[in-house]
A protein has these predicted regions:
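Surface-exposed, beta-sheet-biased, low-hydrophobicity segments with strongly acidic/polar composition
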Residues: 19-191
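Sec-dependent bacterial lipoprotein signal peptides
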Residues: 1-19
Length: 191
C-alpha cells in the first residue's frame, strides 16, 4: 500500500513538472483600486446595498445566501461597524471565513496585508480614515481559490466619509485578486 502511494505521488510530481509552467505560483492580475458608497444596515431599505463583495468588487445588498464578505452599519456616534458575513446571516452552505484587522498608519503606506491573526468572530468599529484589512477565504466549491495553496483574497479599505443623515458610507479600497498574495502596491503583485 505504501508503494502505491509513493508511485501516485511520483506520478503527480512528474505530471506537474511536465507541464512546463514556470509561472505556476506567480500572480497574474494587477491590484485594483475602487471607491464605493454603501448604505447602513439599519435605517435604510433592505434592497439598498449595505455590504461588499470584495472579490467581485461591488457593493451588494445583504441576502440570506451570504453572497458578500462584509456588511456595514453606522452606530449612534457616527462610527462605522464592519461585520463579517457570518455575524449577519447563517447560510445553508456553511460559513465562509472572513477576517478583519485594523491597521495603523496612512492608507497609502499600507502596502501589504499583515501576516497575523485576523479577527473572524466579532465586528470591528472604525472611525473615518482608519485602515482595515479584510482576509476573505475564497476556497468554497466553484470559488476563485478553490484549488489554490492559499485560499485568501486580501483587501484594504478606509472609510472616507459617513453621512449620518442619509445613512451612507463612502469607502476606498485596494484589492489583490490573486489567491494568497498580500500586496496592495500598484501592478501585478510579487508577494
Amino acid at each position: 500500500m505504501a508503494f502505491r502511494k509513493l508511485a501516485v505521488a511520483a506520478a503527480a510530481v512528474t505530471l506537474l513538472s511536465a507541464c512546463g509552467d514556470n509561472n505556476l505560483f506567480n500572480a497574474t492580475a494587477p491590484t485594483i483600486s475602487d471607491v464605493y458608497t454603501v448604505f447602513a444596515l439599519t435605517g435604510t431599505p433592505p434592497a439598498y446595498p449595505s455590504a461588499l463583495d470584495t472579490y467581485f468588487r461591488q457593493p451588494v445588498r445583504v441576502d440570506g445566501a451570504g453572497s458578500f464578505d462584509v456588511a456595514f452599519d453606522i452606530d449612534p456616534s457616527g462610527k462605522v461597524i464592519i461585520y463579517p458575513v457570518k455575524l449577519v446571516v447563517r447560510t445553508l452552505t456553511g460559513e465562509r471565513r472572513i477576517g478583519l484587522m485594523r491597521v495603523t498608519g496612512d492608507f497609502d503606506l499600507v502596502t501589504s496585508a499583515p501576516k497575523a491573526t485576523y479577527q473572524t468572530d466579532s465586528a470591528l468599529v472604525v472611525s473615518p480614515h482608519e485602515v482595515v484589512v479584510i482576509e476573505a477565504a475564497r476556497n468554497g466549491s466553484g470559488d476563485a481559490c478553490q484549488f489554490a495553496l492559499s485560499p485568501n483574497i486580501y483587501t484594504k479599505l478606509i472609510v472616507d466619509s459617513v453621512a449620518v443623515a442619509t445613512r451612507t458610507i463612502t469607502l476606498q479600497t485596494v484589492m489583490d485578486p490573486n489567491c494568497g498574495f498580500r500586496s496592495f502596491e500598484e501592478g501585478i503583485p510579487k508577494n
